[in-house]
Design a protein with these regions (language model features):
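Conserved adenine-nucleotide phosphate-binding loops and their immediately adjacent elements
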Residues: 1-4
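Conserved helicase NTPase motor core
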Residues: 7-17, 21-25, 36, 56, ...
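ATP-binding Walker
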Residues: 31-32
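Walker A/P-loop NTP-binding motif
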Residues: 35-50, 67, 71, 241
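Basic/charged alpha-beta structural segments of nucleotide/phosphate-handling enzymes
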Residues: 117, 121-193, 211
């Protein structure tokens, strides 16, 4: 154990070894929070015998997640580093296992901006829109705002409507905004594709509608750690609350703002 605690100050040692219940650490840049997170993960595995696959550690960039995986591997020697990922990356793992609950295949497509632009090109060509009507950048922003704020139940169209029913909504749309939005949903459904916003709301929907799947993940994730807690948004906060509701072991790190 002393190897895992070597070089840590008193506050960091306390953060690493206080494993049960709700633990909040206020830490800014340069305070050694990444070291505390990685040592805490290694402590849970090496000293408490927790399987890496029963730990979720959320970071806010893929780069940070990769660096944390590397550090934990160096500490534990275990190639299994559990669920060390962004919220979106974790939701990909959930959906790859349980997308059948919303009648999506396990090999769904996760969209990036270039994929979205390719879909927009199809919509613009089909409906004679031009970039004067709305630029691709503005269209991407509009779609995100519609999904997050104006039409938060949009995902039900993707899940419950048939492809023909979505196409009918797209065909009936008569403003650039509605044409682009429903055309995009139709393209998503046609390709079994999900963007970053969809990943979280689909996961939340499955957890809300399917108690068996929700309990499976709640029981699996005995310990949850979240970095940069002050930056999480409302859907991410809801997801965190669902996941930690069973074991109630939550460790969060953030600056003094939260």
């Amino acid at each position: 154990m002393e190897d895992l605690l070597h070089g840590l100050n008193d506050a960091q040692r306390e953060a690493v070894t206080t494993t049960e219940g709700f633990v909040r650490v206020i830490a800014g840049a340069g305070s050694g929070k990444t070291r505390a997170l990685t040592r805490r993960f290694a402590y849970l595995v090496s000293e408490m015998g927790i399987l890496p696959g029963n730990i979720l550690c959320v970071t806010f960039t893929n780069k940070a997640a990769s660096e944390m995986c590397r550090r934990i591997h160096n500490l534990t020697g275990d190639n299994d580093t559990g669920y060390i990922n962004t919220f979106h990356g974790f939701c990909v793992s959930v959906l790859q296992e349980d997308s059948h609950a919303v009648s999506y295949p396990k090999r769904f497509l996760v969209l990036d901006n270039s994929d979205v632009d390719a879909m927009l090109r199809i919509i613009y060509e089909e409906r004679d829109l031009s970039l004067r009507d709305m630029s691709f950048s503005a269209a991407r922003d509009m779609i995100e705002i519609e999904k997050l704020k104006n039409r938060p139940d949009y995902y039900l169209d993707l899940i419950r409507l048939s492809l023909d029913e979505l196409k009918e909504k797209y065909d009936r749309a008569d403003t650039a905004r509605d044409i682009i939005f429903y055309g995009y949903l139709w393209q998503e459904k046609k390709c079994f594709a999900l963007d970053y916003n969809d990943l979280i709301v689909f996961t939340l929907h499955i957890f809300s509608e399917n108690e068996e799947i929700r309990l499976k993940w709640q029981k699996r994730l005995e310990y949850i750690m979240i970095d940069e807690f002050q930056d999480i948004d409302e859907p991410q906060y809801r997801l965190m609350k669902v996941l930690c509701a069973y074991h109630k072991n939550l460790f969060i790190v953030g600056d003094g703002v939260y």
